[in-house]
């Protein structure tokens, strides 16, 4: 035998004193390798696109206390403004645009009406494989009318046969954050995956402010001394607790002839947020809060080489059912010291126990046809329906009473694009 050749064995019988000449032929050892697939990273692909786009490699930030929103602040032109501690209201700006001008997607699926628990400042960085930021003009595949841009959270779809990822952190103001992700891909292609995370914080940090003092007389009436704004006190926040929990379950199959990926997922989230102040810091609330939950099933189907080679199909559908309650029913008035007196009317700001219900469903069809390595045609159609209803749960009868007109939005967006990419150094997109 020899290195690189097959081993050959032959039996030879010799009589005493006999000599025999034996010819031995050895053949080269050929080993058939499995299919080798060469791919480029999603981060590099986005950064080289013709769009004004940047991709952040989230894997480099895994197992840190960073959130998706915190990672986005590393992108030029992206600004984050939070009104307080953990779970506070957040505004994300892309080149000066915010609000409805900036849309959020997860794996290309729009997240309108997903609920406060899935705000970017509440989702841990481990949930994402990478974060794509498109500024201004966006690919037709998103099918959105966002003039400011799009943020697309891309999760890890190739985790391995079996995986487990978990993290926990504890910080100031009794802040707890935890995350766990586990799943398995079996030999027959069946897969399951579970993601779960939670955030909790008392948010009892100190503020420097003046205090509206009061005195309760013997007859029960309340006297208000003149407000002295020159006296500033160092006091703790006492009605600003926040917590949220979310679970994302997913089952499906991968690597089948009829589907490269078929996955059904179900998301559930809950949040509770106490409200310390209103627009003005000197107006303090001691019992006002907001809570809500969200249910969101979704379906994803992906097939390469559909009917003909180089024709890829992606179908997605999701439904978000989000319910939020704003509760302000206390008959007390508080100051920054946590002191209170009883009022003759209910409601620290405005008497309410309201319910807002969001129903949102989306369907996406996206087809890519590749001609060689340089030409790509993309067709996309997105249909969406959003409905919001609000009602109040107050009154002696404790019955639901409508107090606003339902808000309904329906959209159908189609797009067709062509991309020419003769090399990695330059490409052209038309749509």
Task: Show which residues each predicted segment covers.
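Face-selective signature of the C-terminal outer-membrane beta-barrel domain
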Residues: 248-271, 290-431
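Outer-membrane beta-barrel translocator domains and adjoining extracellular loop/strand segments
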Residues: 180-181, 205-213, 274-283, 326-334, ...
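Periplasmic-side early beta-strands and strand-to-turn transitions of outer-membrane beta-barrels
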Residues: 160, 169, 185-280
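A beta-strand signature from Gram-negative outer-membrane beta-barrel systems
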Residues: 125-167
């Amino acid at each position: 035998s020899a290195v690189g050749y097959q081993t050959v064995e032959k039996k030879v019988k010799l009589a005493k004193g006999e000599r025999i000449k034996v010819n031995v032929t050895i053949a080269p050892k050929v080993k058939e390798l499995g299919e080798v697939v060469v791919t480029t990273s999603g981060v590099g692909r986005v950064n080289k696109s013709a769009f004004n786009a940047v991709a952040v490699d989230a894997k480099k930030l895994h197992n840190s206390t960073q959130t998706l929103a915190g990672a986005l602040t590393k992108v030029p032109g992206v600004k984050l403004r939070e009104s307080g501690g953990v779970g506070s209201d957040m505004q994300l700006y892309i080149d000066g645009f915010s609000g409805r001008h900036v849309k959020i997607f997860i794996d290309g699926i729009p997240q309108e009406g997903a609920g406060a628990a899935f705000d970017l400042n509440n989702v841990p960085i481990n949930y994402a494989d990478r974060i794509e930021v498109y500024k201004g003009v966006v690919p037709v595949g998103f099918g959105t009318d966002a003039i400011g841009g799009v943020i697309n959270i891309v999760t890890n779809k190739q985790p391995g046969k079996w995986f487990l990822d978990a993290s926990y952190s504890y910080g100031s103001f009794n802040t707890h954050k935890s995350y766990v992700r586990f799943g398995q891909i079996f030999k027959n292609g069946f897969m399951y995956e579970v993601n779960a995370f939670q955030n909790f914080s008392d948010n009892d940090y100190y503020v420097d402010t003046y205090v509206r003092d009061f005195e309760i007389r013997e007859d029960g009436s309340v006297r208000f001394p003149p407000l002295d704004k020159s006296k500033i006190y160092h006091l703790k926040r006492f009605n600003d607790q926040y917590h949220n929990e979310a679970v994302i379950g997913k089952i499906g199959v991968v690597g089948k002839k009829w589907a490269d990926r078929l996955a059904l997922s179900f998301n559930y989230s809950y949040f509770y947020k106490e409200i310390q102040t209103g627009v003005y810091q000197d107006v303090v609330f001691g019992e006002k809060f907001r809570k809500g939950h969200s249910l969101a099933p979704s379906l994803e189907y992906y097939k390469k080489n559909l009917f003909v080679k180089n024709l890829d199909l992606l179908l997605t559908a999701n439904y978000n059912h989000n319910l939020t309650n704003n509760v302000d029913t206390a008959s007390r008035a508080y100051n920054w010291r946590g002191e209170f007196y009883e009022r003759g009317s209910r409601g620290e700001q405005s008497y309410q126990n309201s319910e807002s219900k969001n129903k949102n469903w989306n369907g996406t069809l996206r087809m890519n046809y590749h001609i060689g390595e340089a030409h790509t045609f993309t067709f996309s159609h997105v249909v969406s329906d959003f409905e919001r209803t609000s009602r109040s749960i107050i009154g002696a009868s404790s019955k639901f009473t409508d107090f606003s007109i339902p808000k309904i939005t329906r959209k159908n967006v189609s797009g067709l694009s062509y991309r020419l990419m003769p090399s990695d150094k330059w490409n052209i997109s038309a749509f």
